[in-house]
């Protein structure tokens, strides 16, 4: 695969990270750069790591993984997003709105796994096309990190809207990404974002 093709693949893989970063920034007031870099770095590491795992896994397990990866991503994103919507609707003030912290711990781990599952499949295609996995993983990780950080910057700019509605929107974004992944894998739809 050419270097330009790998860059385009990296941009496509980072779309979910971008949307999730916007959602997280919208549900947390004034996300600090340290947190942005931690989450963006985690997304970049998971994207690169999953691509490497997919590359080395090879075709022997491709059918097994592809039979359930979309369900895992859908389930994680829908549960996390649904909980964010529920907490935003139930919350009475800004202090109670964000109980599920997606910037660290299990919350961050869940969204990092869910947004990087597609990179596993892409890693398989890298092995088939004799792509340099070191360079490809570096590009996928770096692009995901940069795009995630930009998502945080954009999310911070719009997070000053009514926080209850922004929390609902952030949760719905996660749910929609889960539905997108499910539709792409089960219905064969090619959805851009």
From Swiss-Prot:
Pfam families associated with the record: Mntp
General function of this protein: Probably functions as a manganese efflux pump.
Keywords from the UniProt entry: Cell membrane, Ion transport, Manganese, Membrane, Transmembrane, Transmembrane helix, Transport
Any one annotated GO CC term: plasma membrane
Protein's name according to its UniProt entry: Putative manganese efflux pump MntP
Residues spanning the membrane: 6-26, 39-59, 61-81, 106-126, 132-152, 165-185
GO molecular function: manganese ion transmembrane transporter activity
Family: Belongs to the MntP (TC 9.B.29) family.
Membrane topology: Multi-pass membrane protein
Subcellular compartments: Cell membrane
């Amino acid at each position: 695969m050419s270097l330009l093709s790998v860059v385009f693949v990296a941009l496509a893989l980072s779309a979910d990270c971008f949307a999730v970063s916007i959602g997280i920034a919208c549900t947390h007031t004034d996300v600090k750069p340290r947190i942005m870099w931690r989450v963006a770095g985690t997304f970049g590491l998971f994207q690169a790591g999953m691509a490497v795992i997919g590359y080395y896994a090879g075709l022997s397990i491709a059918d097994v993984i592809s039979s359930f990866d979309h369900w895992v991503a859908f389930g994680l994103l829908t549960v996390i997003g649904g909980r964010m919507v529920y907490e935003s609707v139930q919350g009475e003030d800004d202090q109670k709105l964000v109980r599920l912290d997606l910037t660290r711990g299990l919350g961050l781990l869940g969204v990092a796994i869910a947004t990087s599952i597609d990179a596993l499949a892409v890693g398989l295609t890298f092995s088939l096309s004799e792509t340099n996995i070191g360079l490809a993983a570096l590009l996928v990780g770096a692009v995901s990190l940069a795009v995630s950080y930009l998502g945080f910057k954009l999310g911070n700019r719009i997070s000053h809207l009514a926080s209850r509605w922004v929390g609902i929107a952030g949760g719905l974004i996660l749910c929609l990404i889960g539905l997108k992944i499910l539709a792409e894998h089960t219905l064969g739809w090619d959805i851009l974002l």
